[in-house]
Amino acid sequence: MGNPKAFLEIHRQEAGYRPIHDRIHDFGEVEQTLSTRERKLQASRCMDCGVPFCHWACPLGNKAPEWNHALYKGDFELAYQLLTSTNPFPEFTGRICPALCEKACVLNRFNHEPTTNREDECAIIEMAFQEGFIQPRTDIQRNGKKVAVIGAGPAGLATANDLNHMGFSVTVFEKNEAAGGLLRYGIPNFKLNKAIIDRRLRLMEAEGITFCYGKAINLENLDDLDNLEKDFDAVVISTGTPTARDLKAPGRELKGVHFALDLLSQQNRVLAGMEFSKEERVTAKGKDVLVIGGGDTGSDCIGTAHRQGCKSVTQIEIMPKPVEGPEDPQNPWPEWPRTLKTTSSHEEGCTRRWNINTLEFLGENGKLTGVKVQEIDWMPNPDGGRPIMVEKGKPEIIKAELVLLAMGFLKPEHPEYPKNVFVCGDAANGASLVVRAMASGRQTAQKVSSFLLG
């Protein structure tokens, strides 16, 4: 630890976002960057704690104290080596991870000014690319074993990357026209520029990984799986959670009611150069938009709606409003705090409401015009089970020409596969964070290696 008093003398400084009046007119990344000097000062605040709770909280087990120290000292190559010893794709997590490590940081308990780990790791990996530290590996020794990875989201990419470095010949099958999964087709460009994904894919291809696009493997068709097993020694299923949670309220069939990914994935494809007919296009332009669901996907819909030129945005959530402030007494540090989160998209403008139940979608001539909702309360269950929903007041109507359902995804069910077939990421565990999917992918790569090589 180079400066043991830095956390006392230097306050947390975030890079912040581009001005709202600028960023809502384009899909460029909203987050700014600090200067190298400022970034090194932020890294110096890391105390190299005796018990590094940041390491405990990170699903990847990132060595934040070690690479923060190297960053502070200006040894960017060492910082890069330490960072990538646990994290295969810091350029992804450095942009979109909620930074579980920061909430568990000892400084967060001390003064609610944790180290800026997420921004630090993004700075390290971008410096590594800029300085040429990252080059395709040419020392990989092949072991003669072949592995198929089905699905090129963060879990599949992490699995493929690790297996390839272990010497396996890896082929990735992806149903879409490009790799990335929700990194590419769910997360907006204003949070993650897709050129960042393409840069990593070029590196993986140069190191020997084969990608087959537009190739959907029907996991319910045993012939598809049998054919893969004939050609590969092991198969990894990393297909994510493709089924969004629906809302079966009356009027669901009206034109204008869509899943969140209908908007998000199409917008990302439009930015990539794909064209859609007027009938196919899902757009918020000139419309009153209602987002149902209070999570990150709903937030992404808000930011996208603003950039498309919506008239207004309202976000409703059936659960109570989270605690405001740095921590919730019900789940104390170092746990992840269940507190109110305000994103860059929320800052761009929206009405947020909690304890709102959706009753009915309303329309005229087959087109959505509004949504009937009901304010509710959650009361304790005398039997100790799930809280009881109690209606308050009278139903009301929220005007809307576009509704976006952002209520999460259903965990897929899988049959019992042969021993050489592995499942990882969201496909195995249900919808979660990109960092958890990557960690699952890395763990699965180790399981495959142990199975095939002993």
What are these regions (language model features)?
Residues 48-73, 93-124, 171, 178, ...:
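Iron-sulfur cluster-binding cysteine motifs and their immediate structural context
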